[in-house]
Structure formats: structure tokens, C-alpha cells
């Protein structure tokens, strides 16, 4: 079972002082052990001295009686010092162990909180990135070439719409393709017909199209889960869609749907690999983006195949960290959204394996 989830304010700036405290605690443990061992050696010498004195006093007979009394006192003192030494060792060991445990707990909390901050950083960057996609699709759905083609489909209007979409793609390289569809889900034109021959393709059953066909205004948008797009040669995409409306007006009559296919894999990989993990931690630390279905949709350890899952023990918290029984620390942060983009229930996750 994982240990309890913790959450709290950033404490990354305390990491150095905690590290110094751990070092001081270890130095104290070593110093105390050396001093106690020294006392025990002196006590042993006193006991040996007392024993030798008792032997010599016995040999001296009547003349050694006084010395015998002194030897007995020395032996008693040695015994008392030995007892005090043992008690001191037990008490110091217990206190140093407690201090060490508290210090390690503070270090773990600081590390966990920093990991949560990194998880937030990853999900915030992708949220801001995808927010821009929602703006793009709603804007481009009002382009006159797109509106004209959706309203009156001819070979000429489709060719011009395709050309216009191609111009947009040349400026926005994060997209694989842009598709203009009619209200029945048929692709009318796309921006890269030389690369993707999708004109006439039926996308009526695609989740993003089903959502987009139900939109009530041009101010709204639809989005599908990260998926592999057969029409785009099996590339992983994040597809955003908006309704194309008469006159490019927000509440004009619906004419069709514009879908924009964000080139997911390379963009997501750049984000997760860009999270600032300390060099000495990189070999045992993974940065993940996990969707609402707990699918791993991006990983710093390699391109995700979208068929792996990672269960997060959130404890109904938006963020936090916990330690598994094998010593692995998991930190997470739910999508906070950005501006009008509420996010899709994703999480940024940092996984740090134990030594």
C-alpha cells in the first residue's frame, strides 16, 4: 500500500539546508559514537587498574589494606562510569535516530513538493499549448475560403479552401493537417492533399466530429482524446474541431466542421523532456502526461504507444505525492486549465524510483 499522500506549499528552496542538516546529524552520530567509545575504553582501563591494585594489595598483606580500599573505590567509580556511558549511548542513539528520521522526513517532503511543482509545470505548459489550439480552430473556421466552400461545395471552392488551409499550415508547423468537413462527416478539403489523400473520407464516427456536430455556436469547440489517425499515416494527434457557420458568424447557420490535427508526439515529447530534472536524478526519474483514462500519452523515457496505463493514487486531491512500498515516489498534479480552456482531466506525473 502506498504511504499517505502529502500536499503543501513549495519548499524547494529549503532543500540545501535540509541536506546540510542531514550531514550534521550524521556527523553528530559519528562524533557521539567516538566519544562514548573513548569513555568505555577509559572505563575498561580503570577496571583493569582496580583489579591489578586489588591483587597487589592482597600480596602486600596488612600493609596493603589501605590501598585495597582505594582500589575498591576505583572499581566502583569505573562501574558507575560504565553504567552512565551505557545510558548515555542509549539516549543519544535514540535521540539521534529520531532527529535523523525527522530530518529525512523533511527531506522527503521537500523533494516530494518539488516533484509536485515539476508535475504542475509539465501540465501547465501543455494546457497553455492546447489552449492556443482551441483559439486557432475557432478562428480558422471563420476564414472566408472555409466558409464559402462549406456553404457551396464546388471543385473550385474546394481547391481554394485547400490552398488557403495549406498557407495556414506553412505558418503553423505544429499541425499535421487541417480538414474541412461537411455536416455529414465527409472531408471536403484538406491543407496537405499531396501528403494526405483524405478528400471524401468519412469521419462521421470520429468522436471529435460527433462532438463538433452538436456545438451550438462558433464560440465553442470539440476535442478528442489523443489518438492514432489512420488518415494521417498512423500519427498520434490531438484533434480540435469547431463548427463552420454562415457568414463566419458565431450564431450563423451551421455549414460544416473544421478539424485541426495537432502533431502530438513530438510536441509532447519536447515538453516532458524539457522538465528540469537534476542530471543525477534523470536515470531514475520519469516525467509523464496521463489522460483522464489513465493512459500514458507522453513519457520522457520514450514515445508513448498509447496502450500503457498508469494508475495514480490521488486520494481525491488535485495534487500531491506518495511513496509506494518499493520506495518509488510518485508526484502528480491535475490540469488547472488555462484561460477558457478547462483541460481534459489530465495529470502531470513525476515518478522517482528508489536507489
Region locations from a protein language model:
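Short, charge-rich amphipathic alpha-helices with coiled-coil/heptad character
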Residues: 3-26, 106-109
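EAAAR-patterned alpha-helical heptad-repeat segments
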Residues: 43-88
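Extracytoplasmic/periplasmic sensory segments of membrane signal-transduction proteins
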Residues: 109-218, 272
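Extracytoplasmic/periplasmic ligand-binding sensor regions of membrane-associated signaling proteins
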Residues: 190-261, 321-323
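Short, glycine-anchored, charge-dense loop/turn motifs used at functional sites
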Residues: 52, 180-194, 249-250, 285-297
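Extracellular/periplasmic juxtamembrane segments that couple receptor/chemosensory ectodomains to their
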Residues: 308-355
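Alpha-helical coiled-coil
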Residues: 27-55, 87-97
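Solvent-exposed, extracytoplasmic
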Residues: 161-171, 257-305, 314
Amino acid at each position: 500500500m502506498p504511504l499517505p499522500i502529502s500536499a503543501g506549499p513549495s519548499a524547494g528552496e529549503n532543500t540545501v539546508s535540509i541536506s546540510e542538516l542531514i550531514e550534521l546529524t550524521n556527523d553528530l552520530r559519528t562524533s557521539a559514537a567516538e566519544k562514548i567509545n573513548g569513555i568505555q575504553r577509559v572505563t575498561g582501563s580503570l577496571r583493569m587498574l582496580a583489579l591489578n591494585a586489588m591483587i597487589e594489595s592482597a600480596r602486600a598483606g596488612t600493609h596493603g589494606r589501605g590501598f585495597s580500599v582505594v582500589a575498591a573505590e576505583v572499581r566502583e567509580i569505573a562501574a558507575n562510569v560504565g553504567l552512565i556511558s551505557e545510558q548515555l549511548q542509549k539516549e543519544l542513539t535514540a535521540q539521534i535516530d529520531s532527529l535523523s528520521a525527522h530530518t529525512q522526513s523533511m527531506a522527503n517532503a521537500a523533494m516530494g513538493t518539488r516533484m509536485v511543482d515539476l508535475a504542475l509545470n509539465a501540465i501547465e505548459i501543455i494546457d497553455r499549448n492546447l489552449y492556443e489550439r482551441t483559439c486557432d480552430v475557432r478562428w480558422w473556421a471563420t476564414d472566408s475560403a472555409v466558409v464559402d466552400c462549406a456553404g457551396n461545395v464546388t471543385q473550385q471552392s474546394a481547391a481554394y479552401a485547400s490552398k488557403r488551409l495549406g498557407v495556414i499550415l506553412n505558418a503553423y508547423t505544429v499541425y499535421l493537417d487541417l480538414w474541412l468537413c461537411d455536416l455529414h462527416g465527409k472531408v471536403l478539403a484538406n491543407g496537405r492533399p499531396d501528403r494526405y489523400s483524405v478528400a471524401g473520407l468519412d469521419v462521421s464516427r470520429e468522436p471529435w466530429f460527433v462532438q463538433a456536430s452538436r456545438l451550438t455556436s462558433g464560440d465553442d469547440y470539440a476535442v478528442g482524446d489523443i489518438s492514432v489517425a489512420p488518415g494521417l499515416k498512423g500519427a498520434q494527434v490531438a484533434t480540435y474541431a469547431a463548427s463552420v457557420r454562415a457568414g463566419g458568424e458565431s450564431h450563423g447557420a451551421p455549414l460544416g466542421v473544421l478539424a485541426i490535427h495537432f502533431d502530438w508526439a513530438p510536441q509532447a515529447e519536447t515538453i516532458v523532456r524539457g522538465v528540469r530534472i537534476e542530471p543525477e536524478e534523470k536515470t531514475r526519474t520519469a516525467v509523464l502526461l496521463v489522460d483522464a483514462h489513465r493512459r500514458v500519452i507522453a513519457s520522457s523515457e520514450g514515445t508513448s504507444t498509447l496502450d500503457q496505463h498508469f494508475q495514480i493514487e490521488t486520494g481525491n486531491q488535485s495534487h500531491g505525492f506518495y511513496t509506494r512500498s518499493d520506495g518509488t515516489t510518485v508526484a502528480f498534479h491535475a490540469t488547472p486549465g488555462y484561460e477558457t480552456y478547462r483541460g481534459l482531466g489530465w495529470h502531470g506525473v513525476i515518478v522517482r524510483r528508489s536507489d
